Amino acid sequence: MYQHNTEKFGSFERHIFSNPSSKNSFSIVPECGAVLIDTFFAGINVIDGFSMPEELESFKWAKSAVLYPFPNRMCDGAYTHDGNTYNFPVDNAATNNAIHGFGKKMPHQIVSMILSENYAAVTCRNDYDGYLPYYPFPCCFEITFTISDDNKMTIGMSLKNTGENTIPTAIGWHPYFAISEKIEDTLLQLPDLQLIEVNERMLPTGKKENYNRFSSLEKINETSLDNGFFYPKSRKKCRSHFTI
């Protein structure tokens, strides 16, 4: 049977969902971006999250952050919508970009919870009223974490426009996985994708190229990946596989 417990995590409260029998569990901090701290299957953690409260306070590397109202980088923090120009704060000094939106540190509330024999699910919500001058668009973001005894974790996200006008938005998630001691020995398999080209400021150039590396399970070795990928809508499922 899954259980729900809480404990102090620095100035935050950590919510732990666990099944002592299967040793499956995960923990989140709703009041700081509903960030996922860890995920255990059979007692083995597969998420490289913020292990200490001090790390969460700094939010370095945005580990397991929810990304909204934009998931990537914004050139000079500026964007135009319906003829109006807005400027997000530049929070990535190295590239002079705004990065990952503001959702990653927004307070979220638990709005539903299921604890059963074989799985646990929790939904967190942030009702944003549009108070920031650089994003004056009310919206509601929800994220649901579900863990089950068949060693699966499912994460579902949605963002609903709660205002009267159209809004510019996109969402994403920023996980770091716990891997073997040497990343070179980690095995990776990807579906057929298109790699999104970026410039020296890590901004998309608008170009894409087919990426067929790792079409079968193979070692990462010296491969460096710091790009986004495009997956055609015509395909119903996108699944990646890695072995640690």
What is each residue range found by the language model?
Residues M1-F88, N92, F242-I244:
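Beta-strand-rich N-terminal accessory domains
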Residues M1-F9, N84, P89-D149:
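Extended, loop-rich substrate-binding clefts of extracytoplasmic carbohydrate-active enzymes
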Residues F9-S11, S22, G33, R73, ...:
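Residues that act as N-cap/strand-start positions at coil-to-secondary-structure junctions
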Residues F17-N19, P30, N126-T169, W173-P175, ...:
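Acidic, contiguous internal or C-terminal segments within carbohydrate-active enzymes
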Residues K23-S25, Y119-T123, C140-E142, K152-T154, ...:
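Intrinsic-disorder/low-complexity, polar/charged segments enriched in Ser/Thr/Lys/Arg/Asp/Glu/Gln
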Residues N24-I28, I143-F145, L188:
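Broad, structure-driven detector of short, well-ordered beta-strand segments within folded domains
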Residues N45-W61, N84-P107, Q189-N210:
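Glycine-rich, pocket-lining loop/helix-strand segments that form or immediately flank
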Residues N87-F88, A93, T166-I167, Y176-I244:
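Active-site/ligand-binding surface loops and adjacent short beta/alpha elements
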